[in-house]
Each structure stands twice: as structure tokens, then as C-alpha cells.
Amino acid sequence: VWCVAAVLNRHAHFRYGRDEAGRIGIWDELHPYYTVPRRDAPDLFAMKVTRFTPDYDAFLSRFREDYARAETCGRLLCDETLPPNVCGISAMPGLAFSAFSFGGDPKPDFTPFVLLGKVHPAGDRTVLPVGGEFAHAVNDGGHISGFFKELEETAAKLFPD
């Protein structure tokens, strides 16, 4: 979650959004809004926001507290109110996918939505599938491929072999 948010926050083209009046602008930062499996109903999940900080250790401490709260909140939305500047991160921990397609209506905002799959071994490596939905109005192929490349580099620095 931190790696995704860190990469998105490094680049203005991933932080486009709309204010309450519908005006387009660039957020100073995005906070990850992510899914957490619920303890009371393992087939359901809860959604939680953790305020982003570029300091990994500080973020991890907040994330662990927020995650524990979300596991036991007993409902879909753990936060009473959400900041407008969030980036969605969801997980499908039971699926080791190689491709994924989002369907439905386009999102009304411009922030990316990132999907994480099942961590699994692949030869001598451990793989975490990652997919994403990006608004073509503000992100083109170069931005998107750059996101995935930088995400891989960020994770490799944080979790060296």
C-alpha cells in the first residue's frame, strides 16, 4: 500500500482531482483508501484510509493501527468521512492474475485505482500481481508504464532480495 501511494504521490499527473465545485486541480497529496478482510465475516471486507507520509516507518505504524481497526469495524466503510484526495487500492488475495479488466461506469475522478492480487512463487521469485485503472484524460501509456516500473523499483528498494 505504501509503495503504491508513494509512487502516485511523486507525480502530479496521478494526483488530478475535482474539488467540491467540480473544478479540476492537482491534490498536494493522495491518501490510500484500501480494502481489509473483516474478522467477523471473512468473505466481506472493510475500507479504510491511512494518511500518507513519505516516511515508510511512520506510515507502517499508522497503517498497522488502521488495519487492525478496519478488521473489526463490522461494516464496509470504517471512516465516518473520507478526505476527497484518496487513491483506491483493493486486493483480491485469492487470485494470482496475469491480466484484469475493469468494467462498469467510468470513475468520476482522475486518481488511479490499483488492484493487488495473490502473492505467489514464480520460479525463484515471489510475485505480487498488480493491475490498475487510470484516467486517460490525464495519464497516457508513458505515465502508466512509468507507474508500474517505478512501483517495481520502489518495492525492490524496500524489500531487497
Task: Please place each PLM-identified region on the residue numbering.
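Acyl/amide activation-and-transfer machinery of modular secondary-metabolite enzymes
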Residues: 1, 28-54, 127-133
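Hydrophobic "lid/gating" helix adjacent to the active-site nucleophile
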Residues: 1-32
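Active-site-proximal acidic secondary-structure segment that organizes catalysis
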Residues: 10-12, 57, 69, 108-161
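Helical lid/core segments from catalytic subdomains that handle acyl or acyl-like groups
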Residues: 38-97
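Flexible, Gly/Pro-enriched loop and linker segments at secondary-structure and domain junctions
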Residues: 83-127
